[in-house]
Amino acid sequence: MASRYQDVLAANPIAQALSPGFAPGQNFLRWRLLDPAAREIYVDWEDAVDAAVSGLRELAGTVPDDPRMQTLIAELSSASPHFRDTWARANVGYRLGVMHLRHPLVGDLYLCRNQLIVPHVPNAVGQHLLIYRAESGSDSARALEKLRSLSAPAG
């Protein structure tokens, strides 16, 4: 679950094991842009960033004069030429499709990405649930299962 600013509000254990960018409290766009580890995990890093920036642009439109959003956009524009260029292209909307990740423990994963928007309710405007899933029976599904077992608490 993420805010309109792409701050991670909650994540299940497998999401957290999949990427440090999904840790609660983390801004996953900032992490993708600025942490070198993101380039190792996202095989097509530019596509992963472009998808997140297009999603942010859509979410920014939900409250156009939001000072926190404007601060985030200014911060990312200053810190990342790639963000600045992608933002200037003005693509809007979360992109569905397959994302290729490379995890250091389980290898390559091809995950379908989806998004569910929380209906407009006070204090939740722009909150959304990100869903990454593997095709049933695929190598990616087996890799996710292995990751789940590796990240499960002992006991």
What does each model-identified segment do?
Residues 1-155:
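Hydrophobic protein-protein interaction segments
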